[in-house]
């Protein structure tokens, strides 16, 4: 008698947590794109899967995944640093590196114009590849005419991620029965907005913890001097921390769109600066979405409805002769607290 194995898949752009600080610093030195945190373009898995226990076969997949690669969500994420550089250029206080940076950001802005936060072609391809890997690795789940039930948040990049993945699954097996939906009706668990927990993320204690870390670990003056020739202009006109974070976001997002083939902004930064900014991003995510004491330690419970849904739908599907798969397409801001809630 064969036993059944349930697979719970939580997919995100996360790197192994056991990686030591020094080894990861070396990896960033070798490949700057790894510093991009949640903007890291989803890397194609290359490891070998752990085989199921003897006598077990996979019969059901329950999945919550982030959308694929996207453009930055807001126009000001491009315009805010660009306008600062343009103002400096207009009065002649930019270095040659600063002038190069203006030209690059203008190209990025043009590529993303009116596509703020939308899925890129790379993002669509990522979900097609995920579908192919799932089908190849778990044929017992997707055999014959089983049901695949898919839900997305109402955000277009998530909907298109879902559609690209489902279309590829159907290409692999035209007999699959697929149903999909993206509705405000399901947002209570697909992307819960808990006002009380949201306020706890923005307390003075959280802000002070972030500011204290920044003061101890960050020094952006050398970077600023590579872009501007006049320190008084910088002091009077620039919020240096925000400006550098904007540049770091732009540098990280490049790898997610087609413009990655023709430009990079990582030449602005030293490897040590990239490592420090990567660390800062980790601190920010921990303070806002994990069980940090500064936020009351309750942020993982923002995904309580999603976890309940995963459990109840698994119970329901496993009562069927052929359970199939339940696929959910959402955001990284759900995945981190969900992972913490699952311990």
Q: How would you name each of these model-derived features?
A:
Residues 22-147, 153-325, 330-343:
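Signature for phosphate-centric chemistry
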Residues 1-24:
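Bacterial Sec-dependent N-terminal signal peptides
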């Amino acid at each position: 008698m064969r036993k059944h194995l349930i697979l719970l898949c939580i997919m995100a752009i996360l790197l192994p947590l056991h990686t030591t600080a020094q080894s990861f610093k070396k990896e960033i030195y070798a490949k700057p794109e790894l510093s991009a945190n949640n903007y890291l373009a989803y890397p194609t898995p290359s490891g070998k899967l752990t085989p199921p226990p003897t006598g077990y076969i996979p019969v059901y997949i329950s999945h919550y995944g982030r959308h694929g690669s996207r453009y930055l969500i807001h126009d000001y994420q491009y315009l805010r640093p660009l306008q600062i550089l343009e103002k400096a250029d207009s009065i002649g206080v930019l270095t040659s590196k600063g002038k190069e940076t203006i030209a690059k950001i203008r190209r990025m802005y043009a590529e993303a114009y009116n596509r703020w936060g939308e899925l890129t072609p790379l993002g669509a391809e990522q979900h097609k590849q995920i579908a192919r890997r799932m089908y190849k690795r778990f044929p017992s789940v997707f055999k014959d005419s089983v049901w695949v039930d898919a839900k997305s948040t109402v955000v277009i990049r998530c909907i298109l991620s879902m559609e690209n993945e489902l279309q590829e699954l159907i290409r692999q097996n035209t007999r699959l029965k697929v149903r999909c939906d993206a509705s405000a009706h399901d947002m209570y668990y697909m992307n819960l907005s808990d006002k009380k927990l949201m306020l706890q993320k923005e307390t003075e204690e959280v802000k002070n913890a972030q500011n204290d870390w920044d003061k101890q670990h960050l020094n952006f003056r050398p970077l600023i001097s590579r872009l501007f020739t006049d320190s008084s202009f910088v002091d009077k006109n620039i919020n240096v921390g925000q400006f550098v974070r904007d540049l770091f976001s732009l540098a990280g997002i490049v790898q997610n769109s087609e413009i990655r083939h023709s430009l990079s902004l990582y030449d602005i930064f030293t490897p040590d600066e990239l490592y420090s900014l990567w660390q800062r991003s980790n601190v920010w995510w921990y303070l806002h979405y994990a069980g940090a004491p500064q936020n009351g330690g309750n942020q993982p419970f923002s995904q309580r409805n999603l976890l309940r849904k995963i459990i109840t739908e698994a119970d329901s599907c496993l009562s069927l002769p052929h359970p199939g798969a339940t696929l959910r397409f959402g955001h990284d801001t759900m995945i981190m607290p969900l992972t913490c809630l699952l311990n």
